């Protein structure tokens, strides 16, 4: 697994920080986005482990910090669920502009709920995995 630090801008102009993990010995067959849990970061052990497993299966995976968390700009106190959805859309736009649109969204806890909602608006998404997501 080789991680590459990347940055992209959300619709509020905040620079979001991410890590793009690519398979070691081949080009990615597909791309995925990993959305972390509430107040966590892209560096959460679960995020790293899931990213590793997906990259070993041929996925390029972008894990990023939501606005105001980790290394991303912005004030966390000014964020809400809608801003999380917008951050996921910004991550997808980054992949589309630089690689190809994501076909898989993965989220943990609140990130899982966010990918369920965001993925329903993205034509490129073929699968969504929500881990411990609070959603009815």
Regions found by a protein language model. Give the residues of each.
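N-terminal cap/lid segment of alpha/beta-hydrolase-fold proteins
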Residues: 1-27
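Short beta-strand element of the alpha/beta-hydrolase
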Residues: 28-37
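The serine-hydrolase catalytic nucleophile loop
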Residues: 38-51, 66
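Active-site loop signature of alpha/beta-hydrolase-fold enzymes
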Residues: 40-41, 67-72, 136
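Conserved alpha/beta-hydrolase
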Residues: 51-73
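Catalytic nucleophile-loop/oxyanion-hole region of alpha/beta-hydrolase
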Residues: 69-100
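Primarily recognizes the serine-hydrolase "nucleophile elbow" in alpha/beta-hydrolase
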Residues: 91-136
